[in-house]
Amino acid sequence: MFQNADDVKKFIADEDVKFVDVRFCDLPGVMQHFTLPATAFDPDAEQAFDGSSIRGFQAIHESDMSLRPDLSTARVDPFRRDKTLNINFFIHDPITGEQYSRDPRNVAKKAEAYLASTGIADTAFFGPEAEFYVFDSVRFATRENESFYHIDSEAGAWNTGALEDNRGYKVRYKGGYFPVPPVDHFADLRAEISLELERSGLQVERQHHEVGTAGQAEINYKFNTLLAAADDLQLFKYIVKNVAWKNGKTATFMPKPIFGDNGSGMHVHQSLWSGGEPLFYDEQGYAGLSDTARYYIGGILKHAPSLLAFTNPTVNSYHRLVPGFEAPVNLVYSQRNRSAAMRIPITGSNPKAKRVEFRAPDASGNPYLAFSALLLAGLDGIKNKIEPAEPIDKDLYELAPEEHANVAQVPTSLGAVLDRLEADHEFLLQGDVFTPDLIETWIDFKRANEIAPLQLRPHPHEFEMYFDV
């Protein structure tokens, strides 16, 4: 939106901007913010903050950190009462001035620089498709003597027998793709989200109800370069959640909020370009893929068990990655085939449209780290000419047992992928994009803050199974 500090100053004055919202991303992937009066904001100055209070950052004895604005990300916040300009910032060490190695946006910036340094390509495009659910209410608690969650939605299949205000037209389990209103209760809400996305600079391509009951949705927008695509995804999630909130609803990108129905994934489309020319197309190759694209796929599939520590980084992620709910649990590639973890979309003979789609990820993690890790895995495949296993152009869910035994599967838990990341991360260290410190911090944080707390607590379903032993 802006190219320099003078542009920002002029906009603030001309548009009577009242506040500037300073935004940055914590290590797990949630945007943080504090707000300055616009009169106190100097786009040439750094902002200080306490890094020890941010998840995954600094210890208390070295807590001071500084923020530098990325003025290209400035957007007017559509939800604040007083006119507010949101700006994403990079994090730096206040003493050395160096980029902070645990700043997710700095990781993405380094990934783009490393790509250019390889000579393989100069641009990587990423197009995430993040699914989400919209509920009317959610209640949950975990205490010493109880643990529960309760979701409700006027469109939920479980409400067909509800007594109050029941006019039918509930979405059946796995029945949400693509019925028209009134079965689709959320067409207007998605339209409102889409218009807000457009006003914020994202180019919406389509929106629809997804397969799941209770308002599962997908809104697709145009791809972007790596760092910008991660920024776009954070903006997308912010707008989805706030439009839902404004309408008395609540939106979640949790991978598996509902037992017995489809989870919410985030298919990630990717392509490499050099000098304005696409590198993934060859009309003679399988599915129109070039050797470069095939090796890129080989790298991602080889490293997928460790990659999932960034692309599917929550305990809940692995409730989605199970057979039977259209989740891509098979680590193979194929054209058109949605049962494969890596799909080659049919794009005709247009070289510029050729891309690969990694279908395993979800939106519960940090997009800056996830996209950077995917790029580095793909580049490792290109540099080392890693051949993927032969493509499988049949329904992988219906393979005979002897065939299925030869198909690699995604790991089944967060603990398993963290173990794999611990053993397989050399490809992430190339170009100093990820550092050993970041990887160690990520693994330790996930084990201590997500795996260990669940190991300490009995699950409610255990009472169904074991109370009367």
From Swiss-Prot:
Domain GS beta-grasp positions: 15-96
**SMART domains associated with the record:** Gln-synt_C (SM01230)
For the ligand (ATP), the binding residues are E205, Y221, K222, F223, H269, Q270, S271, R338, R343, K352
Cofactor annotation comment? Binds 2 Mg(2+) ions per subunit.
Organism, per UniProt?
Answer: Streptomyces coelicolor (strain ATCC BAA-471 / A3(2) / M145)
User: Which purpose does this protein serve, as stated in its record?
Assistant: Catalyzes the ATP-dependent biosynthesis of glutamine from glutamate and ammonia. Complements L-glutamine auxotrophy of an E.coli glnA mutant.
Q: What is this protein called?
A: Glutamine synthetase
Single GO MF descriptor: glutamine synthetase activity
User: Which cofactors, if any, are listed as required?
Assistant: Mg(2+)
One GO term of the biological process aspect: glutamine biosynthetic process
Residues binding Mg(2+) 2 are: E131, E210, E218
Q: Which gene encodes it?
A: glnA
Result of knocking out the encoding gene:
Grows on defined Evans agar supplemented with ammonium chloride as a sole nitrogen source. However, double deletion mutant glnA/glnII is not able to grow on this medium and is auxotrophic for glutamine, indicating that both encode glutamine synthetases.
**Family membership:** Belongs to the glutamine synthetase family.
> Where does this one sit in the cell?
Cytoplasm
E.C. designation(s): 6.3.1.2
